Amino acid sequence: MAHKKAGGSTRNGRDSESKRLGVKLFGGQAVKAGNILVRQRGTKFHAGYGVGLGKDHTLFAKVDGVVKFETKGAFGRKYVSIVAA
């Protein structure tokens, strides 16, 4: 009898596509207005001087300059700012 019994079915075998989040331009790097600095879920990083916040919490440069990361305030919030080159 050359028959093979049916194998079981698995409930695994799927995964979501990665969202490519994270810091895109690091401290000390030169940027132009419109460049994306950080892609994030929620405000892990807050917008400082010269930085805008998109509706999906993406941080982007509003002016030309150099990226600066800093921690400020009583809660230790991380801010991303643009300083003049």
Curated annotation (Swiss-Prot):
InterPro entries: Ribosomal_bL27 (IPR001684), Ribosomal_bL27_CS (IPR018261)
Coiled-coil ranges (or none): none
Cross-referenced Pfam families: Ribosomal_L27
Keywords: Ribonucleoprotein, Ribosomal protein
Organism: Pseudomonas aeruginosa (strain ATCC 15692 / DSM 22644 / CIP 104116 / JCM 14847 / LMG 12228 / 1C / PRS 101 / PAO1)
Signal sequence bounds: none
Protein name per the record: Large ribosomal subunit protein bL27
GO CC annotation terms, alphabetical: cytosolic large ribosomal subunit
GO BP: translation
Disulfide bonds: none
Entry's Gene Ontology molecular function annotations: structural constituent of ribosome
Classification via NCBIfam families: L27 (TIGR00062)
Homology family: Belongs to the bacterial ribosomal protein bL27 family.
UniProt lineage: Bacteria, Pseudomonadati, Pseudomonadota, Gammaproteobacteria, Pseudomonadales
